């Protein structure tokens, strides 16, 4: 779980990360970074490449789910249940073959995209807090995916 200080940092930086577009731009940037570093992943998601129009749509969905997780920062059980349910839903997308090992490189791309948007506000404490939050979120997603 996250410490009180980590929850505070996440809540404070989320406002800037979400911005006016609820994080959609960060989500798109995250997936472009991820697909540029791992071009073979485009086919897994059914994309023609990083410039595929579906990238922006999926990026917006990813950040919307991060927003849901952030909204449950004070209730870890609820956050885990919600993210596990998202993982279970992804099991139903059988043609996509989403695997647990995709989450770590995706997390690196996400933190990079967040830092790109908020600059210096993504200091060492914020990076640590978001890395811990992403580990919790992705852990819950993976448990749903593998259930």
Swiss-Prot record:
Gene3D superfamilies, alphabetized: Globins
CDD domains for the chain: Mb-like
Statement: the UniProt record of this protein carries the keyword Nucleus: no
Binding site for heme b: 90
Domain Globin residues, every copy: 1-146
Stretches assigned to coiled coil: none
Site positions for Causes a bend in the G helix: 105
Sorted UniProt keywords: Heme, Iron, Metal-binding, Oxygen transport, Transport
One Gene Ontology molecular-function label: heme binding
Pfam families xref list: Globin
Family membership: Belongs to the globin family.
Further comment found in the protein's record: X-ray crystallographic analysis indicates that the D helix is absent, Leu-58 replaces the distal His (of myoglobin E7), His-90 binds covalently to the heme iron, the F helix has several more residues than in mammalian globins, and Pro-105 (G7) causes a bend in the G helix.
Name the record gives this protein: Globin, major monomeric component
Organism: Glycera dibranchiata
């Amino acid at each position: 779980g996250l410490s009180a200080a980590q929850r505070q940092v996440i809540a404070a930086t989320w406002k800037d990360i979400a911005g006016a577009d609820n994080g959609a731009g960060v989500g798109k940037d995250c997936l472009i970074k991820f697909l540029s570093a791992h071009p073979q992943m485009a086919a897994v998601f059914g994309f023609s490449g990083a410039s595929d129009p579906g990238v922006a749509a999926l990026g917006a969905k990813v950040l919307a789910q991060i927003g849901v997780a952030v909204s449950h920062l004070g209730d870890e059980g609820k956050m885990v249940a919600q993210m596990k349910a998202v993982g279970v839903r992804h099991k139903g997308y059988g043609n996509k073959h989403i695997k647990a090992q995709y989450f770590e490189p995706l997390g690196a791309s996400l933190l990079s995209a967040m830092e790109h948007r908020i600059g210096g506000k993504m200091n060492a404490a914020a990076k640590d807090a978001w890395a811990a939050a992403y580990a919790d979120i992705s852990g819950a997603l993976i448990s749903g995916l593998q259930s």
